[in-house]
Amino acid sequence: MRLMVSGGGTGGHIYPALALIKQVKQSEPDSQILYVGTSKGLESKIVPDSGIDFKTINIQGFKRSLSLENFKTIGLFLSSVVKARKMVKEFKPDVVLGTGGYVSGAVVFAASMMGVPTVIHEQNSVVGVTNKFLSKFVKKIAISFEAAASQFPTKKVVLTGNPRATEVAQIKPSGLSQFGLDDKVPTVLIFGGSRGAEKINQVTIDTLEELMERPYQTIFVTGRVHFERLTKDIDLAKYQGKIAILPYIANMPEILSNMEVIVGRAGATSLAEITSLGIPSILIPSPYVTNDHQTKNAMSLVNNDAAEIIKESDLTSEALINTLDTLMLDQKFRNVMAENAKKMGQPRAAENLYDVLKSVSK
């Protein structure tokens, strides 16, 4: 298979693409793959570091208010389509996959206009602007949440799940002794995303003394940019053996399966990971994302009794510890929630998406 992939800007668009590429290489070792992204997005480092051929297109998003910048954006989009056509013509892909972000709009649109089979993957419950635009032109639309189906042309939609779920399900877990914790003690992970989340961090700091009294242990990941400020007045040694306070965990997927409960945001990739592993969660959707899509992602789990939700505006030390205790001190309830999360998981998501690509490829 000659596969062209495009997706960029955030990890939520990039990591599912990389997981799919891994599946393609496993299934077809002689496959040829080209990833098209931007020079400024996260993909410009992550993709080449993964050993994947990478080319760039200069593009930017539209401003939500009336702006002269939008005229520049239209010009950039049109020139990006021209550049994308040239890349498609040179690479001659059997199929093109877009995983979101403005760059995928130019690439997938160009390929569609050239008669090349195209597929888009939507990670969220609420459809992104780029994928909504592309849905008119592509052959198939792969979705991660059933809630997204009604926002697309019905005949094109396939529920595949998020390919990241497959990757995480296959990772060999590592122990908790590396953090000074006991592998046999039930553990909670509190994690506000790779950059951390200020409100989650502050409330967790305010809850440390209560967490010390609980029969479970905690891993609290602050995000690198917040760590020094949050811990400058804290005696970290005081919490050793009970609460591990860390700036970042490089091998995060390796420790997830050791968690009894995860507290964090409701990004699409995170939810794909925790449902794939069948882990109960307390979700605190980010109020800063487009169309409040994290709340809608979270409700997909809450409505299936696979997660609890706390709005950031309602997040207090009391709300956090009470919700944690509800899950962590009631193993029967936690087990039911874990089963429900597992039922929602799509550990074959990468294979499912690969099958969709094969079904439309030349």
Swiss-Prot record:
Main location: membrane
InterPro entries named among the record's database cross-references: GlcNAc_MurG (IPR006009), Glyco_trans_28_C (IPR007235), GlycoTrans_28_N (IPR004276)
Binding site for UDP-N-acetyl-alpha-D-glucosamine: 10-12, 124, 194, 249, 294
GO molecular function list: undecaprenyldiphospho-muramoylpentapeptide beta-N-acetylglucosaminyltransferase activity
Subcellular location: Cell membrane
Pathway: Cell wall biogenesis; peptidoglycan biosynthesis
Swiss-Prot/TrEMBL keywords: Cell cycle, Cell division, Cell membrane, Cell shape, Cell wall biogenesis/degradation, Glycosyltransferase, Membrane, Peptidoglycan synthesis, Transferase
Domain of life: Bacteria
Reaction(s) catalysed by this chain's protein: Mur2Ac(oyl-L-Ala-gamma-D-Glu-L-Lys-D-Ala-D-Ala)-di-trans,octa-cis-undecaprenyl diphosphate + UDP-N-acetyl-alpha-D-glucosamine = beta-D-GlcNAc-(1->4)-Mur2Ac(oyl-L-Ala-gamma-D-Glu-L-Lys-D-Ala-D-Ala)-di-trans,octa-cis-undecaprenyl diphosphate + UDP + H(+)
Keyword hit for Endoplasmic reticulum: no
GO BP terms: carbohydrate metabolic process; cell division; cell wall organization; lipid glycosylation; peptidoglycan biosynthetic process; regulation of cell shape
HAMAP family from the UniProt entry: MurG
Protein name per the record: UDP-N-acetylglucosamine--N-acetylmuramyl-(pentapeptide) pyrophosphoryl-undecaprenol N-acetylglucosamine transferase
Source organism (scientific name): Pediococcus pentosaceus (strain ATCC 25745 / CCUG 21536 / LMG 10740 / 183-1w)
